Regions:
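N-terminal lobe/hinge region of extracytoplasmic solute-binding protein
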Residues: 48-98, 215-216
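Extracytoplasmic/peripheral linker and loop segments enriched in polar/acidic and small residues
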Residues: 363-369, 423-432, 457-525, 548
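Append "and occasionally in soluble cytosolic enzymes with long acidic Gly/Pro-rich linkers
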Residues: 311-413, 500
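Long beta-strand-rich cores associated with HINT superfamily self-processing modules
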Residues: 521-548
Length: 548
């Protein structure tokens, strides 16, 4: 199985192009015509990237599957190109003031929504202020807008205080309270997509649940939506670059069962699947349609620090130290993940242009690849539970896809070795993320794939008021370090603050890193070409072309 080095990829660019494995094994029998057969003469690419999404409202989504769908149907001010560089999106150009506090974006002339109505700079004012609306409760609000003037007043309820303005229909101006070295990356982030005020005010939260009301501005727009079956996105004729979109649409098959996806792929019904059955990995490694590539992100465990005994950091540390990360990633997960020694892993870039993890902890990993059983037992004893005595049976919650159940069963065995009994609760995907976000768990499977390469994107997750802080980790010292990283103009001071924050997080076991992500998928290139994959875990279909 060929894999690519994220270190090399991220040093040059933040995007990777697909590389497969050489083999002469039999491939699926699908053809371009069979893939598009259900839609007549239209060139429809049939794919699977996940089950029914929890949401595809750009302001509310925090999942990769939903993000992949939003990516096809919306376009931000800026985008990431194939080389991982920031490129024009709806904005054809932009300027930054000398002090780094004012960004002026010039929109393309004649932009339209998918329903044909004009899209103007005022739509961005509305959309960005909506992200701050406490009634919307956007999980990314603090991450993407806390550096904008008036954010504190906006998040408290007066969204008009967020200092963004539209001097005219094609000019959008953002005023920052402090310089942000990665703000251009935020302007390319899906949460800050423009959304249409008319459709949201007319339909409320339901606007993002049906083809009739899901108005967008990207290369594709939703034309059919059958919940738990499929979402059909067709080429958006009102997209500014529609003439360069080669396919007529994308059919997202909403399949949660990886075996069902695999069968549909092998039968030729689907040309691309993200969810590959883990039991098939060994037999797929030599196939030239099986791809494995690194992405920036970490598979980790959230521990609910608001519940006993997890409010005791020694309990959390014991659970973390008892994990053999090398065995888990390389044996049980068959090398499709990499063992994590840190929370912030490969691909995240430090202020000096080197990889952040190489400068952490004196250049050494915080965790050894193997379990530290004696250290785990000592931590458990320090917590007042020698050999697990007096500790109640704990519950680990996860959804049942990919390796999640495998990880859960391993944790049962690993933690049993230090005297900790564990029950596993399997939760369907539709219920899992809301449950986790609401804190209705003890221990839960979690993970984060980068939205941009700055390490703050990972470390902000554990800031006490962050909407994605599922374990409710709360350490004022940690918060101060994150706040310093947001406001300082000194790159060295910023780097030191972020490194100290990670050190504190690891010492507190505020969460438990398990493995670094790779993406693995099946893609039939006898049917489709032009799909490209980014280091942020997204597949881009706007350049796709059906063969034949």
């Amino acid at each position: 199985m060929k894999t690519r080095s994220l270190t090399l990829l991220m040093a040059a660019a933040m995007t990777v192009s697909a590389v497969g494995c050489s083999s002469n094994d039999t491939k699926p029998t699908s053809t371009a015509s069979s893939t598009a057969a259900a839609t007549g003469d239209k060139k429809i690419l049939s794919v699977q990237i996940g089950p029914n999404p929890e949401t595809i409202d750009p302001a509310l989504n925090s999942a990769v599957d939903g993000g992949n769908m939003i990516l096809q149907s919306f376009e931000c001010l800026l985008t990431n190109d194939k080389e991982g560089k920031i490129a024009p999106g709806t904005a054809e150009s932009w300027e930054v003031s000398e002090d780094g506090l004012t960004y002026t974006f010039k929109l393309r002339e004649g932009l339209k929504w998918s329903d044909g109505k004009p899209l103007t700079a005022n739509d961005f004012v509305y959309s960005w202020q909506r992200v701050c609306d406490p009634a919307v409760a956007a999980p990314y609000a603090e991450t993407v807008l806390s550096m904008v003037e008036g954010y504190d007043e906006a998040i408290a309820g007066d969204i008009t205080k967020l200092n963004v303005e539209a001097p005219d229909d094609t000019t959008f101006v953002v005023h920052l309270s402090n310089a942000c070295p990665y703000f251009e990356s935020l302007a390319a982030f899906a949460t800050l997509s423009p959304v249409q005020k008319d459709t949201i005010e007319a339909n409320g939260d339901a606007w993002a649940t049906s083809a009739e009301t899901y108005v967008s501005n990207g290369p594709f727009h939703v034309t059919e939506w059958v919940p738990n079956s499929y979402i059909l996105m067709e080429k958006n004729p009102n997209y500014w670059d529609a003439e360069n979109i080669k396919i007529d649409g994308i059919k997202f098959n909403l399949i949660e069962d990886a075996n069902a996806s695999y069968n549909a792929y092998n039968s030729g019904e689907i040309a691309f699947i993200k969810d590959v059955p883990t039991e098939e990995i060994a037999s797929l490694k030599d196939r030239d349609d099986f791809f494995v590539e690194p992405i920036i992100g970490t598979y980790y465990i959230s521990v609910n620090t608001e519940k006993e005994p997890f409010n005791n950091k020694d309990v959390r540390r014991a659970l973390s130290l008892a994990i053999d990360r090398d065995y888990l990633a390389n044996t049980l997960m068959q090398g499709t993940y990499s063992p994590s020694g840190n929370f912030v892993g490969p691909g995240w870039m430090d202020t000096d242009g080197t990889e952040f993890y190489k400068n952490s902890n004196g250049g050494e990993s915080f965790y050894t690849p193997e379990a530290d059983i004696e250290g785990a037992k000592a931590a458990l004893e320090a917590a007042g539970y020698p050999n697990g005595e007096g500790l109640p049976t704990l519950t680990y919650s996860t959804n049942d896809s990919g390796y999640h159940k495998t990880v859960a069963e391993y944790l049962q065995q690993a933690w049993k070795e230090i005297g900790v009994n564990l029950d596993v609760e399997i939760v369907e995907w539709a219920s899992f993320t809301p449950m986790r976000r609401n804190g209705d768990f003890e221990i839960a499977r979690n993970g984060w794939v980068g939205d941009y390469s700055d390490p703050s994107n990972m470390l902000e997750l554990l800031y006490s008021t962050n909407g994605n802080n599922d374990g409710k980790y709360n350490n004022p010292e940690y918060d101060k370090l994150i706040e310093l990283s947001r406001t300082t103009l000194d790159p060295k001071e910023r780097s030191e603050a972020l490194h100290k924050a990670e050190e504190l997080l690891i010492d507190d076991a505020g969460c438990i890193p398990v493995a670094y992500y790779n993406d693995f998928w099946l893609e039939n290139r006898d049917v489709v070409t032009g799909i490209w994959h980014s280091a942020y875990g997204y597949w881009h279909f706007e350049d796709a072309e059906l063969v034949g």
